Amino acid sequence: MEQPVGQPAYVLHSRAYKETSALVDFFTPQGRMRAVLRRARSKGGSLVRPFVSLEVELRGRGELKNVSRMDSTGIAAWLHGDALFSGLYLNELLMRLLPAEAPFPTIFEHYTLTLQALAEGRPLEPLLRSFEWRLLDELGYAFSLNQDVNDQPIAADGLYRLRVDAGLERVELLQPGLFRGIELLALAEADWDAPGALLAAKRLMRQALAVHLGAKPLVSRELFRKR
């Protein structure tokens, strides 16, 4: 019988399951895993909360596994205020966009570092935009910020629109939702101090993610608006 192997993990989401169990979605380097935690009200159940660095052993070959062991591996990333809402936003992105049981070790590493940075109180917007971009890239949805859809260099004085299925397209007529070339070039260099860069990055990532997230609103985004 195959023995479970411990792996690092974070809880993305959990809910009550039957009388004393919980259905838990974990994020691990091996992907998003769903498992049943028996006796969820016991001492181990106190670890079933977001942003706690864990080591878990999961049993089972199907999509719904069982937690055979779960231990904390360090100090939790205590998030408060807007940092907490930001962390919940990251979790919701992973829940909505990651296919089940598909390995994404690079995203896992970047997620861990982003949680640490949020806990340290670093500026939120650059952290969120960087994570969104890395997520799009790892999922195969990224596009060039240096070249347009016709393989021409992004011009600082140009205007561009995002074609989600292809990339950035230069346009001549002013219309809603466009991006200035100088802003796109700043984003390509992760120059968050450039005028307009953070706002442009937020608009660009929202447009890029929308088609993959679908019509259902993000709960974390609504919570952030109502804070």
Curated annotation (Swiss-Prot):
Keywords: DNA damage, DNA recombination, DNA repair
Signal sequence interval, chain numbering: none
Cystine crosslinks: none
Gene Ontology biological process terms in this record: DNA recombination; double-strand break repair
SUPFAM superfamilies: ArfGap/RecO-like zinc finger, Nucleic acid-binding proteins
A Pfam family matched in the record: RecO_N
GO cellular component: a single term: bacterial nucleoid
Gene3D superfamilies: Nucleic acid-binding proteins (2.40.50.140), Recombination protein O, C-terminal domain (1.20.1440.120)
Record has DNA damage as a keyword: yes
Family (UniProt): Belongs to the RecO family.
Role played: Involved in DNA repair and RecF pathway recombination.
Protein name in the entry: DNA repair protein RecO
